[in-house]
């Protein structure tokens, strides 16, 4: 009897200990999980739930953006972004919601039309072997519908970030009737070099005219799927100059990697890395790698599209002024001012072309 009573007496203590252990374990696990996860907002960013909804107004009070506004009317840039159906909602949407808002015209070029996005269907397949076909048809599209609406024609990938104001400043030193194009200049394969596809490149109106003429006359052909090399070859054949896009301090403005790679990576530790043998201009590591008026970076994640947008257009250090703000060139003062065209053109498909280049 005493043994039974002893067991009964110990039962509440045992149950209490077990319950206490379970509660402690549950609370500890909950705290660990909570501390191991980023805040809710960041978890939403990682899940791509809030990114398209992020609004980034560029109005600041007080702020003088008169120079930028003036250049946007003198140096009009059409931006076309190479993308695909599977990338519209994962990559292209974040390009659309960030830097392309600073373009005079922004077009998203895909293999098929998406009227909701909207994206222009070029009637090509998908894959790396179709990149040059997309490029050929996209530039033909821009030539047919926008030749007289902008002076410059910029191509970018859907993971490229571009500071359009800096691009306009660089282009303001030139005129659109010059046969020239700019980008991150590589040197293999082509005598005058060619521009990296990932860092983006921009053609003058005259360069675009010559590109289209090259295909009309058969001087330029689709001979390789390597888009940037192929367009560089066509540019050289048509007498289009590979321009120097470095700033007045001889620092690079177009970049084929994200900012942190150029700022922190030691390219010199691996001289076998392809980048060493490709660059026309000397590679500079560290803070001097990049121009204060940098134009583009490649391999930018959706989150970093908005991060860069914030850093460039919103973040300020109190009490500091920009240490490098070059004036506009004399050429920029002589450029005509264009009145904004309110007419919105419908997105067309490749079928609207008159004898577009066809895949062989």
From Swiss-Prot:
It is an enzyme of class 2 (transferase). One of its GO terms (cellular component) is membrane. Its main location: membrane. A glycoprotein binds at residue 274. Disulfide bonds join 79-103, 220-234, 289-290. The chain crosses the membrane at residues 8-28. GO terms for molecular function: glycoprotein-N-acetylgalactosamine 3-beta-galactosyltransferase activity; metal ion binding; nucleotide binding. Keywords: Disulfide bond, Glycoprotein, Glycosyltransferase, Manganese, Membrane, Metal-binding, Nucleotide-binding, Signal-anchor, Transferase, Transmembrane, Transmembrane helix. The keyword Cell membrane does not apply. The keyword Lipoprotein does not apply. Mn(2+) binds at residues 157, 159, 298. Signal peptide: none annotated. Residues 1-7 are cytoplasmic. It comes from the Eukaryota. One of its GO terms (biological process) is angiogenesis. Belongs to the glycosyltransferase 31 family. Beta3-Gal-T subfamily. PANTHER family: BETA1,3-GALACTOSYLTRANSFERASE (PTHR23033), GLYCOPROTEIN-N-ACETYLGALACTOSAMINE 3-BETA-GALACTOSYLTRANSFERASE 1 (PTHR23033:SF51). This is Glycoprotein-N-acetylgalactosamine 3-beta-galactosyltransferase 1. It comes from Xenopus laevis (African clawed frog). The lineage of its organism: Eukaryota, Metazoa, Chordata, Craniata, Vertebrata.
């Amino acid at each position: 009897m005493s043994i039974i009573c002893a067991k009964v007496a110990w039962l509440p203590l045992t149950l209490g200990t077990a319950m206490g252990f379970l509660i402690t374990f549950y609370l500890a696990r909950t705290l660990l999980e909570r501390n191991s996860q980023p805040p809710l907002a960041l978890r939403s960013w990682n899940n791509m739930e809030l990114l398209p909804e992020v609004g980034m107004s560029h109005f600041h009070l007080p702020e003088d953006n008169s120079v930028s506004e003036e250049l946007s009317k003198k140096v009009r840039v059409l931006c076309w972004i190479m993308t695909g159906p599977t990338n519209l909602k994962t990559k292209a949407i974040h390009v659309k919601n960030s830097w392309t808002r600073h373009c005079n015209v922004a077009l998203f070029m895909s293999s098929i039309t998406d009227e909701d996005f909207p994206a222009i269907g070029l009637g090509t397949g998908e894959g790396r072997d179709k990149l040059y076909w997309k490029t050929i048809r996209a530039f033909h599209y821009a030539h047919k519908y926008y030749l007289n609406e902008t002076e410059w024609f910029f191509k970018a990938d859907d993971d490229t970030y571009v500071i359009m104001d800096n691009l306009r400043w660089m282009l303001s030193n030139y005129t659109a009737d010059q046969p020239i194009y700019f980008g991150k200049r590589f040197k293999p394969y082509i005598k005058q070099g060619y521009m990296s596809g990932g860092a983006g490149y921009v053609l003058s109106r005259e360069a675009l005219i010559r590109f289209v003429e090259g295909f009309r006359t058969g001087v330029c052909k689709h001979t390789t799927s390597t888009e940037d090399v192929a367009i560089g070859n066509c540019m050289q054949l048509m007498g289009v100059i590979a321009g120097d896009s470095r700033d007045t301090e001889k620092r690079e403005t177009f970049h084929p990697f994200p900012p942190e790679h150029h700022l922190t990576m030691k390219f010199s530790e691996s001289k076998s890395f392809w980048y060493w043998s490709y660059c026309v201009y000397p590679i500079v590591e560290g803070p001097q790698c990049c121009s204060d008026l940098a134009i583009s970076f490649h391999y930018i994640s959706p989150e970093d599209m908005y991060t860069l947008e914030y850093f460039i257009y919103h973040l300020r250090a109190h009490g500091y002024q920009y240490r490098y703000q070059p004036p506009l060139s004399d050429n920029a003062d002589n450029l005509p001012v264009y009145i904004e065209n309110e007419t919105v053109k419908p997105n067309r498909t490749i079928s609207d072309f008159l004898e577009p280049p066809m895949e062989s």
